[in-house]
Amino acid sequence: MKRKRNLYHLWFCFAMLLFLAVPFKVKAETATTPVSISVQYGQTEARTILNMINEMRTSSTDAWYWKQDDTTKTYCTNLQPLQYDYDLEKTAMQRAAEIAIIYSHTRPNNKDTFSAFYENSVYYTYAGENIAAGYGTADSVNDGWREDNELYAGQGHRRNMLNSKFNCVGIGHVYYNGFHYWVENFAYRDKVNTTPVSADNTETTLTIPVATSKISNFNITFDKDEYSLKTGESTSISVSDPAISVFGHWGSRFVFVTDTPDLTIADSTVATLSGSITGISEGDTTISASLYGLTAHQTAAVKVHNCENHWDDGKITTPPTCTKTGVKQYTCTICSETKTEEIAALGHDYSSDWTIDTAAACETVYLLLHRTIQVW
């Protein structure tokens, strides 16, 4: 693998396996974790690369590569055009999604590149693979794979494209998290599948086994840093952008996944969590998220309060009168919820130096006063 210098700092890699009559050496099984990602296939554009490869293979001027001395060229004469193999395309599409997670000829499950061929029942005598990341178009990635200006050590992709032992190719292309990933799978097959199928340009969720040892640092985003609620009250909670660090990933810091994390509340005596958060008793607790056996370092605070413990001193909003009750309003100092309390009516006070204090209705008082005035 080597780094190519251009706007995106793009990467290439190639592999070739020849004379595969001997079965693969079986490796010890690697512990894997199923990781789901959403990719956008771009097979209509990917298929246009076939003509570009064949133009190069059949050109009298372009079908060459440097010898190891870097001073003389090997010219590839009488190369036959490659056929498009739709079985190989399926394998290339799978590999394109896999290199979006780990950019390597070693698959995310730690198996050899060509194990993907056998998993898709693609049998061959010779096989090779070119991979690339970051190129936005079929033309640009093909130009990169051609390696016109490289010396022998840098023309591995070119030699795959010009290999006389191959008779077919399948090409895969996915767009994931802002980057394009491309795969060319070459082979010699006795029976090439040339039966056309519709080009897949769909957005698809795939579950890919990833070596557990390569996964670390689960991250998540809560919709709130803190959830404040009253006892007996429920509130919604949501998370977004679940992502993991994967050793060997190219393009961005994290692999964003579509799997749903598990949410756990630390103290269920304060609040419970079942789709939403419900306050149980006054106190503080936290919510954590976990996925693939990893716990995110991000947490969300949960604060539950009982308004009965947090009313202010209150203020009179409706003063009482002699005949009407008043209203006093209290406000919770935590959530600003309010409650009201009735204030008793003031009543009447008739006591004086010349009258007898007598409780009476207002109308009666008027009559008494009227009679008193008459007496004076």
Regions picked out by a protein language model, each given a short descriptive name:
Residues L20-A31:
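Sec-dependent signal peptide cleavage junction
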Residues E29-N120, R158, S164-V169:
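Short, well-ordered surface patches within globular domains
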Residues Q94-E98, N110-N193:
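A well-ordered secondary-structure block
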Residues T212-N309, T325-K328, T333, E337-E341, ...:
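Extracytoplasmic soluble-region selector
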